[in-house]
Amino acid sequence: MEQTGRLTLPTDADVVAETLRLKNLLGADALRDCDGTEMPKELLTDPAKKYATYYTTRKDNAWAEANPDEVQQEYLISDRHTARGTKLRIHLMGGFHTQQLKVNTLDDPKRWWEVIDRTTGEVVPTDKWFFDEPTGEVEIETVPYHEYTVSFLAFLIWDPVHMYNFLTNDWKDTPHQLTYDVRQPKTQAYVKEKLRRWCEANPHIDVVRFTTFFHQFTLTFDDQKREKFVEWFGYSASVSPYILEKFEKWAGYKFRPEFIVDQGYHNTMFRVPSKEFRDFIEFQQQEVCKLAKEMVDIVHSYGKEAMMFLGDHWIGTEPYGKYFASIGLDAVVGSVGSGVTLRMISDIKGVKYTEGRLLPYFFPDVFTEGGDPIGEARTNWMKARRAILRSPLDRIGYGGYLKLASNWPGFIDEIQNVVGEFRQIHENMQGTKSYVAPFKVAILNCWGGLRKWMSNQVHHSIYHRETYSAEGVLECLSGMPFDVEFIDFDDIRSGIPKDIGVIINVGDAYTAFSGAENWIDEKVVTAIRKFVDEGGGFIGVGEPTACQHQGRYFQLSDVMGVDREMGFSLSTDKYNTCDPHHFILEDIDTAVDFGEGTSRIYAQGKHYQILAQDGEYSQLVVNEYGKGHSVYFAGLPYSPQNCRILLRAIYYAAGMPEEMKHYYVTNVDTEVTVFPETKRIAVINNADAEEKTDLYIKGHLIDSLTLAPREMRWVDDAE
């Protein structure tokens, strides 16, 4: 078995001896510094690979202070204010933290700002308002009792990630780091030359770990230093008059701040992206990837590898976009908080290797009294392990303060187990693919392939009550035996690919993930009806196909056999009876967890079967539609049992229930992954208790296993 390699450990100046001890104990072959730590000089000659975290946009306050016009900027929108007369004054920085943000008074407000009457949606003419710089207020000529907002540019005078780390770690004497805009001419030339000098001065560094390139995801703090707005996918801080003038020339139309602030929603992933915002993302991808390639080329010219951290200043790189591979990166590394976020990294193409930074991060917010770093490591690994078996990372690692991890009783033992299992997976798979079903599963939403494994997320692996019942679908799929595609509605209009067996639509009504007005396009609904009628499968979760139109809320209510009562059809009686006896629930002994669920779902039609109900309303319904099948879930949070239910639902919807038992384990807390080329089978226990399970291949009992808590057992494929 592999005893060394595939592991990166953090280090710092005060833990040299401990770094070497753990490097040898865990078999690490790479060392890294982190934000707030430094690579010890004593380790520069160690044979391990050395990663250096490199910041293109910060850690040079002297440059930022000397060039205030090229500090990074963000579009902000003021709070809504109601006019009670014909004049209204709005204080722009109300609710924002003035140590992080500063109003841009260098560029013409009448050119780059926008005042909007939010009652009518009309733009207030520029001669009807003015900016009073001494007070920081905008005075507006108003219509009484109309609401108004001001969209404006602000300088980011404290890097958001540095601010987050500063507050999280309670740093006291660390200067606030300004963030400068590498896209602008003076700074771009300076940063390129600075990178060359850095490469020359650091010959012992093997890997330049860009953290990241040029634009931070939107991370805005309020006036009490709390997070005010966080959008891991947000483009609001990727703007400046310089960039926007270039965009106008590229796009052929005038830019508006509303394209970014989006009524105050800031184009979160949940919003159906407008044409203008899609254009902006396309433009930013082209420009960011082109400049990133220039930075990578500099690194390569010094014989070093270039690695990108998928996070922080990653905006514009879009790893699943059509320009990412042109950057020429050697590797991508990202934070792994779940199976979904692991697949977000491991499925990236166009790099030589991928690396996952496992949780917990070695920061005091976890390694403290009342914290449970061992429990977090176990939970994180059980989710990550499922996904690795399907789409493996090449490497794993950790970040933060090593001494916190080293001093926590039992934590290093837990890491030793994780690293050992990770190496076992690679040893047994030997670079081959795991078995998958003979059809593909497609996730349908407005983002499609640009945002693979990113659906229904508010922030990176952060729990939200409003989303966990939908996020569970992707989390389950991340470790399942299916090739998963991500398609958008234009893909449906162009023709559903022949290799897709099941389409899944999951999300809340009118979000980008459900689809909103796309569902009143006859080309979309007729294409999917035809697909299912001819034998395809459709699975809906939450409010799939939802858009009130022509007497229906779910536009494919005929396909799914369900609709949602919106109050309009209460006078129509519904007679729904539950019958839980079905292939989908054959393994299930306990009640199904639908999470927050979706209320007022009723079955309708002639070919449905209700498998679970909440009072008179339905939670799990199957339906026959021509030669095809559909399944509706009111919600589906991640759990081992729900993974089994979804597995069965997909095979049922595809019309191939017998195929599910090609490789099969009986206990719902266990799963099986098969590598046909190496004839090795992994059976994993996803529970914290001992579990017994039977392994079947093509209907034949191969083995009866008793698995320890969280165990992964390897057996030979006897087929």
Predicted region positions:
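Catalytic domains of carbohydrate-active enzymes, especially glycoside hydrolases
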Residues: 8, 13-49, 195-209, 331-332, ...
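Hydrophobic targeting/anchoring helices
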Residues: 26, 62-64, 195-196, 209-213, ...
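Extracellular ligand-binding/catalytic regions of CAZymes and related secreted enzymes
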Residues: 219-222, 403-435, 552-555, 559-570, ...
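Short, well-ordered secondary-structure micro-motifs within conserved domains or adaptor modules
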Residues: 328-334, 495-517
